[in-house]
Amino acid sequence: MYEYKGKSAFGGIAIGRIKVYSKEQQQVKRMHIDDCESEKQRYINAVDKAVEQLGMLYDKALKEVGEANAAIFEMHQIMLEDDDYKESVLNIIDNQNVNAEYAVAQTSDNFSSMFAAMDDEYMRGRALDVRDISERLITILSGGKSSTIESDEPSIIIAEDLAPSETVQMDKEKILSFVSVKGSVNSHTAILARTMGIPALIGTKGVLDEDIDGLTGIVDGFNGVVYINPDSETLDRYKKEQAKYIEQKELLNRLKGKEDVTLDGTKIKLYANIGNVKDIALVLANDAAGIGLFRSEFIYLERTDFPTEEEQFNIYKTVAENMAGKPAIIRTLDIGADKQCDYFNLDKEDNPALGVRAIRICLTRTDIFKTQLRALYRASAYGNIHIMYPMIANMWEIDRIKEIENEVKAELAAQEIKIGSPKTGIMIETPAAAMISDELAKKVDFFSIGTNDLTQYTLAVDRQNPKLDTFFDAHHPAVLKMIKMVVDNAHKAGIWAGICGELGADTSLTQKFLEMGVDELSVSPGRILPIRKIIRDTDVSEL
């Protein structure tokens, strides 16, 4: 029996035959080209063909796994048309007199290395997207065939890495689990696994070191372990655990469509946190009442240049339409600190967590801010969009935001562009905002308490420093007292207050939050039903 550790992308237990997927590596040779113009045209033709193929993949994914998962292929089309990517390929052809295949391969290496080196895990996941579109181009240019994954029976798919174009073409009935050596929890494969509700592991080092194709495997998505050729004792133990898990899952699934209300009638809203359009499928599949946090900064982080108003509008409009009237709270740009974006040209800071970030960037770079607000106000005409501003610490910041909002609305009205009337709220994630929350509550429609940063700033602990893990205590009495104060101040002003940080998903505090009168919890989609069960089993009057 072999045992390998990985990082869980989704929980669950899978038992079955292993299917190893190893795609044929494309050998790209460097060739001297005399006619660079013809070679550049050959590349442009390949881009057109790739865009056409991606359109077909989008249609297939749309039918099989929904619009949110299909959106990855629209993103790939945008990446193919990206000016920086295209310019890099064309310049290499021109400057080095080389074939288009080689120029694409070089560009792929450069761009994927850039993404892979980023601190943010979501952005590291974009390295695979770059490689995927590049391999598609090289296949078209060289006249090759795309790899496909085929299996005669439901199997555990194990691979070095899996690209979106590979997973979408699989027969979903034949997939028990995904296990990859590389990848990230934000990769398309991980998101697809969460949508399908099957266990998945990424970063599973060494799993392909042995010849394992056709052997029996066990994937434990809860503990991040895969067993190859398990002994009878391990197999029997996991069969029992799998049966127990299936029973628990069925019980939780029965809670879909049920109200988030306690035994004594206390109501609370359960919303979901997401970072991209693809995750909307998870929001809907887990029966969330809305989106409590859409992290719009990822629209910026996955690019090499500023997204246009139209690009942002289309994304926010998709969110609004997919949620079909349910609230979708979109947080404005939250770049800075641990989320850096090179093309913003921000100065290097000694302490970025206390530096120019989030709303501070927006209020000093109003051109960027107004572009995003224009897109949000336009999209609000298509659904129930709320706008949320991060990192607030001062009353004057709210006043300035209101001025900019009014400027944007006036500009759109002058252009006769349709807009909605979105609710606007703020994140309470600085002690300053918590302490003046009684005054802030008079100027906004809702509060969302960001417990990650609130804990960091309250306890003076850098949450990015692993040496301080012992000191980072989100259960600290000071943090909980601050949350209670914010909730009370919100209610006095007649607005609602929710929690969107890690604490929201902490089941040991669910009853405490109910007792405090918290109106909304926003958590990862997979935590919705387990927390709903706790809520429905609780009598607040007895706490």
Give each language-model segment a name.
Residues 49, 133, 188-192, 282, ...:
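Residues within well-formed alpha-helices
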Residues 113-151, 219-242, 440-471:
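N-terminal-biased segments
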Residues 2-28, 142, 149-154, 158-285:
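Acidic, glycine-rich flexible loop/linker segments
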Residues 80-128, 194-218, 294, 302-321, ...:
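Short, charged N-terminal helix-start/capping segments
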Residues 38-41, 45, 71, 84, ...:
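Conserved active-site and cofactor/substrate-binding residues in soluble primary-metabolism enzymes
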Residues 249-543:
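Conserved alpha/beta-domain cores
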